[in-house]
């Protein structure tokens, strides 16, 4: 201890070294051991002398001197008296800094409950004592007595008595016959009387006996807290305080303002209240005041202490003089302004500045322009030291003067200092790691920072007044990291998807597009040129045009690396572009011998990077930027009013659509269609019309016109801008020259009347008014979106922050299967794009020859992917973060390629944070609205399956019938069509919908692109399996069925209506039956009668007495009604998936494979059970609300995981029924869907990393012989450790299932309480951690930032690994010594110790 105290005064001593931090409840003895003295008076400082009052809140005797090495009365001054205590004022002569470290205490006259343990839910005191919070408060706030010892009276233990009852009982039983107390003393006695070991045994026994689920949960909660107290060494009575610690005075300062007033920290006010009330209570006790007065004073003391610890948690908030709530100790930690987030996780730093940015087109990619004034200020200390070294100044003062006068030699020295000293530029908001990059500064005049145009997209910067901050890395290590890791030239690829991020945009794209245009009939067409000089000469002489078709002799490089010449047909502009390409055999002229749009340019940069490396790419990018800017300026592209071409056929389309809309209106008025249908149809018609007009306009704009000479005319400027990807989109062009189209209301509904005019024609007043509606919502949305997206990113970072690459290989054989994603016949994501940069679990083989294409454990590069795709491999099983078996972090093999570098991932890479940033950063581009689907949006519903391969058709679970029309119809739900190669390899499998019309049969040969089956996506059929005549049951006109005549077609259709509401209809069970010749209901082959139950809204397709064949449709249920549901899209959907929330109308999923049986209806629910195929399992039963449509019939066979009721599946159900792999596939696909819609590319592995973090907990199903409690959620690591221990001791291990936690919940339940407390719900997290005596092993990033260390990632990880190796080696040596020591006694003479050599 003395050493520590001595270290306090030596500012150079290293900080205490520690590996972990433990938090627990402080006992009164502990608080006293921290304290340097008791505070007895509420006074702070004397207002005349400004000296602290003795024994007050700022007392110098307790907390230390105010001035360094000077006692209060001034008797002892200076260093020589260090450590002496002045006999006059009792102040120790030492540094005033101790006033930040020394604590005091207040001895309370009556015990007080700690509000965190009382009120923070669940109440810890309440759980331990098994009392409700209400009762506890009644005792604590002196309303009721509690019986501690009933003695021989009729009172019960822990019975509550009001004042009157207490007095009555005393009269009745006599004063000493029982003990009852009131207030915190009573609770303290109760807590002290708990025998935890006994209590634990009782609770475990009760849990074994109880059958009620609720009771079991309650007991488990209590048991958990009892165990926590037993194992942590905390005593329950410590939750009641007798001593309050007082924090050091310099952490709650009192600052004199001018005018004799003081500014003070709120804590001083709160402490003052506590001291005042405490002193008053002491005095009242000495005076033997009446009980009621003392009791009131005790209650007030309790309230004062409550307010000090957590103001406003109970009762009303205590406010200061200006009606502002006082900030208590808890508020100091909580929220964005609290200690954690404001000071520990984010700090303001020196050596930084900020200024407006302007474009710097003449900079190189690794440079930024730094204003001289800023540089001078930022590098001041460096300049001083250099001035001193050169002998230009002898003192700092002198150097300061030189710099202030800005002498010429200072500028020379600044140049020297800045050379090769990178600076960091940061643009807020820093949404991903590319928001901070390092550049070499170039000194410039002026006051604005110059930024290279190509890095703008990484910073998301533009030059409309954006500001950026500059930071100077000081130490050599920091400079090294800035240069090697953060230099803009080292960040060419986007960490989210591995695409180049240094991509030209806007003017540069337009210039490059213009250069690469080829036009027919330009001057000099067909001329040939041998080299660049000839070409430039001809261009200057205007003999040829930039766009003329010419022949050119191109010097490329062949595979051997030698120069190879060949003739190519191209244009002069493209040759200029081609000359910038680096020479490489793989990068040919064909790469740029086409029209360069933004996408093409990105592709070229990608190719150059993959083949020629980083340095060449950077040089190439700088060059094409210069070329692009120059040509954009030379081309002089601008646009006028006539460039917006209104298509000729516009009004014709508008008129037809108008008549259509009128027809729909008329049909609605005649009652043929509902309002909803009319709305959908009208909206549909108008959106089709505006699409058509847009097509027409694009056609007219994009066609190249001819001039009088027969040459191609200039391309339309607007089309050039949009087509090149420089600015504007077809949607914007449509509004300029087509028609503006439909507008949305703020609710997201679409207004039926469209805006027919475009901006060129101008809008009418009504149209303008309609359009303001949606536009205003758009702006409001953007503001909300930014906040929501930021919050999502914060939650993601928090859940994944401790996910780091820690080892090379975890050696697992598990993985997840990847296949191409196909939607409605179009390829959404190819297999290659999904497995690039991943590691296969097993050898990837050619399906035709069975040759190994990629060995297991190889990182798949582009070359491997080409081979895999050519061989036509359908599915590859790859290693994934989800299946990685490491305890801490993820291994290199399971992660694969580091997307930002294109190489295998490095040790210590913080992949969790990268994943969080990659998912969160595009969040601002996602939409916020929920789409109301109806009309146009459902036309892309998939309604057929076609084959992507040639081969033979094999049908599993076959059940096909030929219906009356002679078509083949699929009769079961689990039929699978497989396409097989001639040599028997499966190439593709398709699940066929029930009621589909089959185009192929078992054993047919099929061609690529041929349809296998098709179905009507808008209805669900009910098919007959038997041949016979139709009979109706319980189908009574007006009661359970109603007939409507469709006037437009003249056909009557009969619809089943809700029969339950009608009189006498409650017991009806409407159905269609198939009767045989004898008029009896037929029996089906699979068991049961040929009776088909009908649900509400089913439309009948047959009449009584009609004959039907198997496969004929008896009735259909329109899914149209289900389709116009709101689909949550954009950000809310992503958040919903990551939070693992249960969707509103969740699907019901079959938990086992089996046969459907309809049971007896239960109230207003239908009962369905599944008879399992596997007889060892028990049947499952589901209750389904009657309004929901069940598309299954009695006797249908379902597979495990099939939907019984349609809807969005709840992720928890998928995990429970189908397992982790299916869940991962579902989450990845659903999240990717949202991002794909916005055109954002994110690699699957990022989502997998987050999902891994969501699956860290296991729910114990059977505790075995371990200490775990059934139903509790345990960390995977803890679960495995406890099980391993149990197995070692020969006990029965526990079993459990993985649980899926939402990201917020997962963050709050991490192993590190520091990380959780700094995230959300700080008080709750800290309370729980303290009760459990939790230890934070400081493994993640956040915890280490909080305690002020290097993070264990990146360069900080290597230090951690070195330490680990050293510890292992030490352990080996110690073990060896112990072994030797054990052997020694049995031998006669002592042997020298043999030590292994140090590594």
UniProtKB/Swiss-Prot annotation:
Entry cofactors: Mg(2+); Zn(2+)
BP term (GO), one: DNA-templated transcription
Any GO MF annotation of the entry: DNA binding
Keywords, in A-Z order: DNA-directed RNA polymerase, Magnesium, Metal-binding, Nucleotidyltransferase, Transcription, Transferase, Zinc
Family: Belongs to the RNA polymerase beta' chain family.
Subunit structure: The RNAP catalytic core consists of 2 alpha, 1 beta, 1 beta' and 1 omega subunit. When a sigma factor is associated with the core the holoenzyme is formed, which can initiate transcription.
Protein name per UniProt: DNA-directed RNA polymerase subunit beta'
Lineage: Bacteria, Pseudomonadati, Pseudomonadota, Alphaproteobacteria, Hyphomicrobiales
């Amino acid at each position: 201890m003395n050493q520590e105290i001595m270290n306090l005064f030596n500012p150079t001593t290293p900080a205490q070294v520690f590996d972990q931090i433990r938090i627990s409840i402080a006992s009164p003895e502990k608080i006293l051991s921290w304290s340097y003295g008791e505070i007895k008076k509420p006074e702070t400082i004397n207002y005349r002398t400004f000296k602290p009052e003795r024994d007050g809140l700022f007392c110098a005797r307790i907390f230390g001197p105010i001035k360094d090495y000077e006692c209060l009365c001034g008797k002892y001054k200076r260093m020589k008296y260090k450590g002496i205590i002045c006999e006059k004022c009792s102040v120790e002569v030492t540094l005033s800094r101790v006033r930040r470290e020394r604590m005091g205490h207040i001895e309370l006259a009556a015990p007080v409950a700690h509000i965190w343990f009382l009120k923070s839910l669940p109440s810890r005191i309440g759980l331990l004592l098994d009392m409700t919070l209400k009762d506890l408060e009644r005792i604590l706030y002196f309303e009721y007595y509690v019986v501690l010892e009933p003695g021989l009276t009729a009172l019960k233990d822990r019975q509550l008595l009001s004042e009157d009852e207490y007095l009555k009982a005393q009269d009745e039983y006599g004063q000493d016959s029982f003990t009852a107390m009131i207030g915190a003393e009573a609770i303290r006695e109760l807590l002290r009387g708990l025998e935890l070991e006994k209590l634990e045994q009782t609770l475990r026994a009760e849990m074994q006996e109880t059958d009620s689920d609720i009771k079991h949960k309650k007991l488990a909660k209590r048991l958990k807290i009892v165990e926590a107290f037993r194992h942590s060494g905390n005593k329950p009575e410590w939750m009641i305080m007798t001593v309050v610690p007082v924090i050091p005075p310099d952490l709650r300062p009192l600052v004199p303002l001018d005018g004799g007033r003081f500014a003070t920290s709120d804590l001083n006010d709160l402490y003052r209240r506590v001291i005042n009330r405490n002193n008053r209570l002491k005095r009242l006790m000495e005076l033997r005041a009446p009980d009621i007065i003392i009791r009131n004073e005790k209650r007030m003391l309790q309230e004062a202490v409550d307010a000090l610890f957590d103001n406003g948690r109970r009762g009303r908030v205590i406010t200061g003089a200006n009606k502002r709530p006082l900030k208590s100790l808890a508020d100091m930690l909580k929220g964005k302004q609290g200690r954690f987030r404001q000071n520990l996780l984010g700090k303001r730093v020196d050596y930084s500045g900020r200024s407006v940015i302007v474009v710097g087109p003449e900079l190189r990619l690794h440079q930024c322009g730094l204003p001289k004034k800023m540089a001078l200020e930022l590098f001041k200390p460096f300049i001083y030291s250099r001035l001193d070294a050169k002998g230009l100044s002898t003192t700092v003062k002198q150097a300061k003067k030189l710099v202030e006068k800005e002498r010429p030699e200072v500028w020379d020295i600044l140049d020297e200092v800045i050379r090769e000293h990178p600076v960091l530029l940061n643009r807020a908001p820093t949404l991903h790691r590319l928001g901070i990059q390092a550049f070499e500064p170039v000194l410039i005049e002026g006051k604005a920072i110059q930024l290279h145009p190509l890095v703008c997209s990484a910073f998301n910067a533009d030059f409309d007044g954006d500001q950026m901050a500059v930071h100077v890395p000081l130490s050599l290590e920091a400079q090294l990291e800035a240069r090697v890791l953060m230099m803009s030239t080292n960040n060419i690829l986007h960490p989210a998807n591995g695409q180049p991020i240094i991509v030209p945009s806007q003017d540069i794209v337009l210039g490059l597009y213009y250069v690469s245009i080829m036009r027919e009939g330009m001057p000099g067409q067909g001329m040939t040129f041998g080299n660049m000089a000839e070409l430039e000469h001809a261009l200057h002489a205007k003999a040829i045009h930039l766009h003329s078709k010419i022949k050119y002799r191109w010097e490329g490089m062949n595979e051997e690396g030698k120069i190879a010449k060949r003739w190519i047909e191209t244009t002069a502009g493209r040759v200029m572009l081609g000359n910038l390409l680096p020479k490489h055999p793989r990068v040919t002229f064909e790469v740029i011998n086409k029209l360069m749009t933004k996408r093409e340019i990105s592709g070229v940069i990608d190719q150059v990077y993959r083949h020629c490396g980083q340095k060449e790419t950077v040089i190439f990018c700088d060059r094409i930027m210069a070329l692009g800017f120059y040509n954009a300026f030379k081309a002089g592209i601008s646009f006028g009013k006539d460039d917006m071409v209104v298509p000729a056929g516009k009004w014709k389309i508008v008129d037809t659509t108008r008549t259509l809309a009128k027809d729909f209106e008329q049909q609605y008025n005649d009652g043929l269609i509902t309002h909803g249908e009319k709305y959908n149809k009208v909206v549909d018609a108008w959106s089709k019309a505006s699409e058509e007009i847009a097509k027409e306009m694009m056609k007219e704009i994009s066609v190249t016109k001819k001039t009088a000479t027969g040459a191609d005319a200039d391309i339309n400027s607007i089309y050039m801008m949009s087509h090149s990807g420089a600015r504007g989109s077809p949607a914007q062009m449509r509004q300029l020259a087509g028609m503006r189209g439909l507008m949305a209301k703020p609710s997201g509904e679409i207004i039926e009347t469209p805006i027919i005019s475009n901006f060129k024609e101008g809008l009418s007043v009504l149209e303008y008014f309609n359009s303001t509606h949606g536009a205003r919502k758009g702006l409001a949305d953007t503001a909300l979106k930014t906040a929501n997206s930021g919050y999502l990113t914060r939650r993601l970072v928090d859940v994944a922050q401790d996910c780091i690459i820690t080892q090379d290989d975890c050696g697992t054989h598990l993985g997840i299967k990847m296949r191409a994603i196909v939607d409605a016949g179009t390829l959404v994501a190819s297999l290659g794009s999904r497995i690039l940069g991943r590691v296969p679990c097993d050898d990837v083989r050619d399906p035709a020859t069975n040759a190994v294409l990629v060995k297991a454990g190889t990182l798949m590069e582009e070359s491997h992917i080409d081979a895999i795709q050519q061989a036509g491999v359908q599915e590859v099983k790859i290693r994934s973060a989800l299946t990685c078996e490491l305890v801490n972090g993820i291994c290199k093999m399971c992660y694969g390629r580091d997307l930002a570098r294109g190489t295998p991932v490095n040790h210590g890479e913080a992949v969790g944070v990268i994943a969080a940033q990659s998912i969160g950063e595009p969040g601002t581009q996602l939409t916020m609205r929920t789409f109301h689907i109806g009309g146009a949006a459902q036309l892309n519903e998939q309604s057929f399956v076609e084959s992507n391969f040639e081969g033979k058709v094999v049908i599993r679970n076959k059940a096909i019938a030929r219906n009356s029309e002679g078509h083949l119809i699929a009769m079961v739900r689990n039929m699978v069509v497989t396409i097989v190669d001639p040599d028997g390899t499966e190439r593709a499998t398709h699940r066929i919908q029930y009621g589909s019309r089959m185009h192929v049969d078992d054993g047919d040969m099929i061609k690529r692109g041929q349809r296998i089956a098709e179905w009507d996506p808008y209805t669900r059929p009910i098919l007959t399996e038997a041949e016979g005549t139709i009979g109706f049951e319980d189908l009574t006109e007006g009661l359970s069925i109603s007939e409507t005549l469709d006037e437009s077609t003249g056909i009557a259709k009969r619809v089943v209506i809700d029969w339950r509401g009608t009189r006498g209809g409650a017991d009806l069970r409407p159905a269609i039956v198939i009767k045989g010749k004898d008029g009896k209901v037929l029996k089906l082959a699979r068991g049961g009668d040929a009776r088909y139950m009908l649900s509400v809204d089913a439309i009948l397709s047959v009449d009584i007495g009609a004959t039907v064949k198997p496969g004929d449709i008896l009735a259909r249920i329109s899914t149209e009604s289900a389709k116009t549901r709101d689909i949550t899209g954009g950000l809310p959907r992503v958040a919903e998936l990551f939070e693992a929330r249960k969707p509103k109308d969740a699907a019901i999923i079959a938990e086992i494979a089996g046969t459907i049986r309809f049971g007896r209806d239960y109230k207003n629910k239908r009962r369905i059970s599944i008879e399992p195929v596997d007889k060892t399992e028990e049947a499952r039963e589901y209750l389904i609300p009657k309004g929901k449509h069940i598309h299954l019939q009695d006797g249908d066979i379902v597979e495990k995981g099939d939907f019984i009721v349609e809807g969005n599946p709840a992720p928890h159900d998928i995990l429970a029924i189908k397992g982790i792999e299916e869940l991962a596939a579902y989450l990845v696909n659903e999240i990717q869907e949202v991002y794909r819609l916005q055109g954002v590319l994110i690699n699957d592995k990022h989502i997998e990393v987050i999902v891994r973090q969501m699956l860290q907990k296991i729910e114990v199903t059977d505790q075995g012989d371990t200490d775990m409690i059934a139903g509790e959620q345990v960390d995977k690591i803890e679960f495995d450790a406890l099980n391993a221990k149990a197995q070692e001791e020969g006990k029965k291990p526990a079993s459990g299932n993985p649980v899926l936690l939402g990201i917020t919940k997962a963050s709050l339940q991490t192993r590190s309480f520091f990380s959780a407390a700094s995230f959300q719900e700080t008080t709750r997290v800290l309370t729980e951690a303290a009760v459990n005596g939790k230890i934070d092993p400081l493994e993640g990033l956040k915890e280490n930032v909080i305690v002020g260390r290097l993070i264990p990632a990146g360069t900080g990880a290597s230090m951690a690994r070195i330490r680990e190796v050293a510890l292992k080696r030490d352990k080996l040596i110690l073990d060896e010594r112990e072994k030797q020591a054990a052997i020694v006694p049995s031998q006669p003479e002592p042997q020298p110790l043999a030590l292994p050599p140090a590594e």
